[in-house]
């Protein structure tokens, strides 16, 4: 099973994101993709644009994780087909994207757009046709306390850092 976890630190609250611009309000995106529980792809970077809301920042982060997940799923599916590995064929049907923003989950799972979020449609909706139980990727809410991607976007207290490190690395 492949599972992405994505997060965004809205408005650059992580700290001084850009040493050339210490008052930057760009959000920091972070995500980790795991395959059978092991981290295989991770990233932390500033978003290219200033987002208008924390939901938009989280949606951008989810979109970035999907840009990595979709080709990885296709590659593993091809390995399964060529090598006759049933475990790769069946387990990839169950990819779950974990997100700690209810607003983002709502945008991902509900195919309608409103005038308030229509500007997100063109830029980030490339993955929408891949989302759904029948398509193989499901977006689910996860508590901020369990969000693995927080380690890439926030300065965490030691106890929380160690908890997330254990969730990611097992130590």
Language model features: what each stretch is:
Residues 1-171:
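Divalent metal-binding acidic/histidine catalytic loops
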